[in-house]
Amino acid sequence: MATYGRDAKALLKELQSQNERMFLVTFLVLNTGHTEQELENNVFQASSIAQKHNCNLCRLDFQQEQGLMSSLPLADCQIEIQRGLTTSSTAIFIPFTTQELYQSGKESLYYGLNALSNNLIMVDRKKLKNPNGLILGTPGSGKSFSAKREIANAFLVTDDDIIINDPEGEYSPLVNRLKGQVIKISPNSTQFINPMDINANYSEEDNPLSLKADFILSLCELVVGGKEGLLPVEKTVIDRCVHLIYRKFFADPCPENMPILEDLYNALLQQDEKEAHHVATALEIYVKGSLNLFNHRTNVNVNNRIVCYDIKELGKQMKKLGMLIVQDQVWGRVTANRSSGKSPRYYMDEMQLLLKEEQTAAYSVEIWKRFRKWGGIPTGLTQNVKDLLSSREVENIFENSDMIIMLNQAAGDRQILAKQLYISPHQLSYVTHSGEGEGLLFFGNVILPFVDRFPTDLELYRIMTTKLGEVSEGAQK
């Protein structure tokens, strides 16, 4: 009696002063087997494990049906065997050490299953302080598929606009199926986008032309080339000409008054400085020569909810220029959408191509810095982690991304990422020789292993996969 009295007093003290509660607990272990013998073996093994820890499991003879119903997630316990446990004791049965990631908002998207608990991962990137994202992985690890899955989910769940920079021509089947606009940019294409396009909201300042002039300077720097870039005199005459050719448009902002590259070329020729003629000569092949693809007014619908810029067939001479112009088109779309409250999502596949050139790399860094303020959500896909950390400026892209989907990584990249993101050796195992659609998800301060086993018998899978045999099959359907 004295022992029971001390135990009762200790329990009362816990309940009164140590924030403990009393729970009546029914603990059930469900055993299954394909045969009666297999079931007996499983019950015996479970009982043996429990006995090692001084716990006796009692078989529910003649109550199997009630035990099964009580084990199902129906909140209906039909077994009247209970034991009183305090909060601390009850918590042992619940795996609180398993990190979960589930946000119940109306714009939360699916990102796979928790590899530890098999629970859904549902998150909304807009709730992050910085929604910028990266998808990193070796070829064949599922980078493009992960991006397409998010694109499809965002299209169905949110009202966001979606813009894709597609250097490999992989996104057209999905975009066409969603009734989006695929803009095929190539020397033989009849679809054109005008690099001189501008809108009234192009800059957060009162003068949008200043920011547009900065883009045109970057464009000319890419065209003129050279290690030193544009000379100060060349920058001066280009800036002067930019202000001249936009006067007519801002006086009467109709599509017919939007300048084209040829207007800049002609304005440069009319200047007295020899440097102006030097820049004009460099532009001539893009105006009157065989590379005059961008010397046209825009003749496609760039305001469709989902737009894909397919630059696969751009030659080596044009690809750098094409990527820079696409970046500017995206910026124009983001600024135009600010007043509508929409959050444009911008996907850059093979992002390492953008980081190889100084001008496109600098523009990408600006996008990462400024998109959040304008409501944009950029996502970069790359297999080259070293390119992301090639310079302090480009490294800002990495540091300003609060969401990273990390798939299988090469050995060298694993070590770089482990150091950069403070990944433990155990966590690193989830991106070491991992299967397709498996890896680590970084969402704010949460790091979670995930798996995404997408059903292969769906039409959506056939138009999203990049596997050679399945791509042709999906294209036919």
Regions found by a protein language model. Give the residues of each.
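Hydrophobic anchor at the beta1->P-loop junction of P-loop NTPases
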Residues: 135
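Short coil/loop residues immediately preceding or within conserved phosphate-binding loops
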Residues: 130
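A generic structural motif
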Residues: 28-38, 138-141, 312-315, 352
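Extended, folded cores of ATP/NTP-driven motor/assembly subunits in large transport
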Residues: 1-98
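Walker A/P-loop NTP-binding active-site region of P-loop NTPases
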Residues: 141-194
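P-loop NTPase motor domains
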Residues: 55-56, 66-121, 126-127, 172-181, ...
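H-loop/switch region of ABC-family ATPase nucleotide-binding domains
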Residues: 382
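C-terminal regions of RecA-like/P-loop NTPase motor modules
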Residues: 1, 64-96, 138-139, 385-477
